Amino acid sequence: MTSQEAPVFVAGSGSNIDRTVSLYRAARRSGRELVIDLYQMILLDKLKALSPGLPPHANDHLKVYYPKNQRDTVVRQWGEGYLLRYASRHINRSKVDFGSGKYLFRVSNGVTKSLCRGFMEAGVKPELVYSMWNGYREKQDSFSRIEELTGAKWQYIHTSGHAYLHTLKRLADGVAPKRLVPVHTLNADDFDRHFENTHQMSNGDELVL
């Protein structure tokens, strides 16, 4: 990523702030503009109140793409004026220099496909980086369609955040929690058999600490 010969598209979770910060730094080191979507920008904006070191920073290299569905949601919840706070960072398809490789994108597959088509038409072949659990790629054919469009292959660069049972047991034994709430799992019902003080909750339930 040190050269600017090709734009780089990264497939990753928009809510993974650590990954976004890593991309922000990589873009700065390589002299690129980092393009994220509206959801990621608002998330960074809200978290910056708690952690001022997070991007964005004044006069930096961060740009914001407004996907229609996200734009409509923001306007519906907060009004059209909310979008003005990011006006100086706004970028859309008409503002992208498709003859340049100076970009690092973290956007949805739909936006990725549209932008990749623009680069290909300009004779610029994008690079693709996949940074999520591989199961998503196997289940969603949008990833293979992007490969077909660009003639590029997704480069797998990812450290999984998933933990195995023996690792979770070591953590629970070390922490000895008064209450253990299973989250982000397909096997919440099994926790009672392996852990003490488990407390199952459903989506929308309130937990009073």
State where each predicted segment sits.
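Acidic/His-rich, metal-assisted hydrolase cores and their charged scaffolds
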Residues: 1-209
